[in-house]
A protein has these predicted regions:
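Short hydrophobic beta-strand element within catalytic cores of glycosyltransferases
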Residues: 322-325
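Nucleotide-activated donor-binding/catalytic signature segment of Leloir-type glycosyltransferases, i.e.
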Residues: 267-285
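Short alpha-helical donor nucleotide-sugar binding micro-motif in glycosyltransferases
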Residues: 284-285, 292-297
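Carbohydrate-associated surface elements
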Residues: 177, 196
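Conserved acidic donor-binding segment of nucleotide-sugar-dependent glycosyltransferases
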Residues: 337-338, 342-349, 358-363
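Acidic anion/phosphate-binding donor-loop and adjacent secondary structure
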Residues: 183-184, 197-213
Length: 394
């Protein structure tokens, strides 16, 4: 039914949690256009050594867009415009984003039958305006900060986001906690569809094989953490937790993959706590190379202060690894049994350390974790999204 249809995706990124489902959904469409918001200010992060610009560096094109193995019928187009993500100034991003998208649609003669906008602002605003102008159905997905933080940042934002929600034909979100917030904002019939993982990229790898491939020591208790080195990820608490664990379990080795504006500060903390042998910063790694790091580890650990529904949690489960983390966003919906991981409140390094120590010495059932994870493969999640698309295009 959809093979003669074109899908327009509006997003703020084109990497894992957007890229993976889009490329599965694309098999059912004639053409998929993905218009990715890009702020040219993000390119200054490596040039101007000021905190504001360094914080924006993670949104530069090289991190924002991943074209690896992109299908031929998916066209990814950066939509560049300047905006300031600061309080009510960020409201101006909506109309600016819309103007740029309209110019791109006209310039490239883009034809579409359905719109799927990811994030309520500013992509959601653009989707709502396009839906009105072209009389096309709009699917809107709320992910994280755009749901639990942005609407409450000011009365103007509350009104703007409520207006966007009113114009969507179908609203999706990634966790039940988000659904409750959206209901309070006036959204009706919100469908919860969690994020997922790519079966092609994340799967069980024998530990010995992974250790050998990565040249990692066999006599260490290796745990993995992946994420931007930013305040919201709570890495200072994880580093302090590793210090506590190392006193009882000197063989612990936490490997961090990623980068961010707090890198220098967090490296200094590791040095100050004298745990350079227990906490290593590996920098960024390609998404398709992460499976071996999961394979080499005992489990995955997160210290996030807030989340929507972290993709890395599903990737961990998809590799047969338990998830040790914090009770934020949709995480407790997924890690709903001690068979799949252990959770604590954020900002509590002592309980996090206790959970890490327990996890090191617990006998985990890898097969049970793998079996549980299958429902969260992007293939399964996308079946539900396709059903929604088909109903809207009838």
């Amino acid at each position: 039914m959809l093979k003669d249809k074109n899908l327009l995706v509006l997003s703020h990124t084109y990497n894992s949690f957007i890229k993976d489902p889009v490329e599965i959904l694309a098999k059912n469409f004639n053409k998929v256009y993905v218009l990715v918001r890009h702020n040219p200010l993000s390119e200054l992060g490596n040039i101007i050594p000021l905190k504001f610009f360094k914080n924006r560096a993670k949104y530069s094109k090289r991190y924002l867009i991943d074209l690896t193995n992109k299908p031929e019928n998916v066209e990814v187009i950066p939509v560049s415009f300047f905006y300031l993500p600061i309080k009510d100034l960020y409201l101006k991003a909506g109309p600016r984003h819309l103007r740029k998208v309209m110019q791109t649609i006209k310039k490239r003669n883009i034809k579409f039958d359905l719109i799927h906008a990811h994030f309520l602002w500013s992509a959601g605003y653009v989707g709502a305006k396009l839906s009105q102008k072209y009389n096309k159905p709009l699917v809107l997905t709320g992910h994280g900060y755009d749901v639990y933080k942005l609407p409450y940042s000011s009365k103007k934002f509350m009104k703007a986001i409520q207006s966007v929600l009113e114009q969507a034909d179908k609203i999706l979100t990634v966790s039940d906690e988000n659904r409750k917030i959206l209901n309070k904002l006036g959204a009706k019939d919100v469908r919860v569809l969690p994020n997922g993982y790519s079966k092609e990229l994340f799967y069980f790898v024998e530990r010995e094989k992974a250790l050998k491939k990565l040249d990692l020591p066999r006599n260490r208790k290796i745990i993995l953490t992946i994420g931007n080195l930013e305040e919201v990820k709570g890495y200072e608490y994880l580093i302090k937790a590793i210090k506590i664990v190392s006193k009882k379990e000197p063989s612990v080795l936490c490997l961090h993959i990623g980068s961010g504006s707090l890198e220098g500060q967090l490296k200094d903390l590791v040095t100050k706590l004298n745990i350079e042998k227990n906490f290593k910063f590996l920098g960024r790694k390609p998404h398709d190379k992460l499976v071996d790091y999961f394979g080499a580890s005992e489990f995955f650990v997160s210290s996030s202060l807030s989340e929507g529904n972290p993709t890395v949690m599903f990737e961990s489960l998809g590799c047969g690894k338990p998830y040790i983390g914090t009770k934020v966003g949709g995480v407790p919906d997924i890690i709903n049994s001690p068979k799949y991981g252990l959770l604590c409140q954020p900002k509590d390094e002592q309980i996090l350390a206790d959970n890490i120590y327990k996890a090191i010495h617990k006998k985990w059932n890898t097969n049970e974790i793998l079996k549980y994870s299958k429902q969260y493969s992007w293939d399964n999640v996308c079946k539900n999204i396709l059903n929604i698309y088909e109903r809207l295009l009838k």
